Structure formats: C-alpha cells, structure tokens
C-alpha cells in the first residue's frame, strides 16, 4: 500500500481551498448540469458541440472537486510557532542577491496554495528548498532555471 502524499499548507490556504470546493459543488456543478440539460434539448447528441463542450466542462469540474477533496483530506496545517528565527513554511523571506542590494520577498507555502503572482512560492520549488531552515544573514546558492546559481543573502524573515 503506497503512502498518500501530504499537502503542507497554512490555515489560510486550507480555508481558501474549502471555499473553492464549496463554490465548485454548489455553483459550478449545477451550472454544468443545466448546460448539459439544455444541450440535450437540441436533439441529436452525435453532432451536438454544445453537449460535447458541456460534458468536457463537467469532467473538468468533477476532476477539480476530486483533487481538492483529496488535498483537504491529506492537508497538514503548518502551525505558526511564532518563531521568525529561520525560514519555514508560512513565513515570508526577504533576500538580496550577492553582490547587490535589490531585495525580493516571497512567502513560502505548500504547493497547493503556491501563486507566484501573489508572491507565494511552493516549499517544493528550488528557491524555497535552498532557503528553508536558513537564518537572517545566511548566504545561500539558489539554483536558476538555466542551470546557473544565484547567491543570495537572507535579509528578513517575517
């Protein structure tokens, strides 16, 4: 029997997934069922593009529901222990490239709630893996997508 993957996440991320799941079940699912019903009323299903599109959408919605339910079932909530002494999941880390002083900040979260456009990176990303467990003042090499590395200094953990 294989071990089920755990999904580390903040309470905020867990709550957001619960809201998304509720929306999928109570809004999106009924919408798709209605689209299928309307498309069926057009008659012949063999050449009914509306029906095919609605069935595809239904498959996507059901897949999302299943995925989110599984993630919530296997979620591991990262408790905030109040310590800001080292980089950990749920913390925002500010670092600067060495040499240089241009700072960047990212919140390290579980993969389920990662969103680079909101400044949230997955704990499984190369940059987060390099930073986790480090302290303010530490310098670390962060792997870049092109195969090179960038040296950064941790400026702040919040």
Curated annotation (Swiss-Prot):
A molecular function GO annotation: DNA binding
InterPro entries according to UniProt: GreA/GreB_C_sf, TF_GreA/GreB_CS, Tscrpt_elong_fac_GreA, Tscrpt_elong_fac_GreA/B, Tscrpt_elong_fac_GreA/B_C, Tscrpt_elong_fac_GreA/B_fam, Tscrpt_elong_fac_GreA/B_N, Tscrpt_elong_fac_GreA/B_N_sf
The keyword tRNA processing belongs to this UniProt entry's keyword annotation: no
The entry's keywords: DNA-binding, Transcription, Transcription regulation
Assigned protein family: Belongs to the GreA/GreB family.
Protein's recorded name: Transcription elongation factor GreA
Superkingdom classification of source: Bacteria
GO biological process: DNA-templated transcription elongation; regulation of DNA-templated transcription elongation
HAMAP family to which the protein is assigned, alphabetical: GreA_GreB (MF_00105)
Xref: Pfam families: GreA_GreB, GreA_GreB_N
Keyword Cell inner membrane part of the UniProt annotation: no
Protein task: Necessary for efficient RNA polymerase transcription elongation past template-encoded arresting sites. The arresting sites in DNA have the property of trapping a certain fraction of elongating RNA polymerases that pass through, resulting in locked ternary complexes. Cleavage of the nascent transcript by cleavage factors such as GreA or GreB allows the resumption of elongation from the new 3'terminus. GreA releases sequences of 2 to 3 nucleotides.
Organism expressing this protein natively: Macrococcus caseolyticus (strain JCSC5402) (Macrococcoides caseolyticum)
Gene3D superfamilies noted in UniProt: Transcription elongation factor, GreA/GreB, C-terminal domain, Transcription elongation factor, GreA/GreB, N-terminal domain
């Amino acid at each position: 029997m294989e071990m089920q993957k755990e999904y580390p996440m903040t309470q905020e991320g867990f709550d957001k997934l619960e809201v998304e799941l509720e929306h999928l079940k109570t809004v999106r699912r009924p919408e798709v069922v209605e689209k299928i019903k309307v498309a069926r009323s057009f008659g012949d299903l063999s050449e009914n593009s509306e029906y095919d599109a609605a069935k595809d959408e239904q498959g996507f919605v059901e897949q999302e529901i299943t995925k989110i339910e599984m993630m919530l079932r296997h979620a591991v909530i990262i408790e905030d222990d109040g310590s800001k002494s080292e980089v950990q999941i749920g913390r925002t880390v500010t670092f600067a490239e060495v040499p240089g002083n241009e700072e960047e900040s990212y919140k390290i979260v579980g993969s389920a709630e990662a969103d680079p456009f909101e400044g949230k990176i997955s704990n499984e990303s190369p940059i987060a893996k390099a930073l986790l467990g480090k302290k303010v003042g530490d310098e670390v090499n962060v792997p870049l997508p092109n195969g090179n590395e960038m040296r950064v200094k941790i400026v702040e953990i919040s």
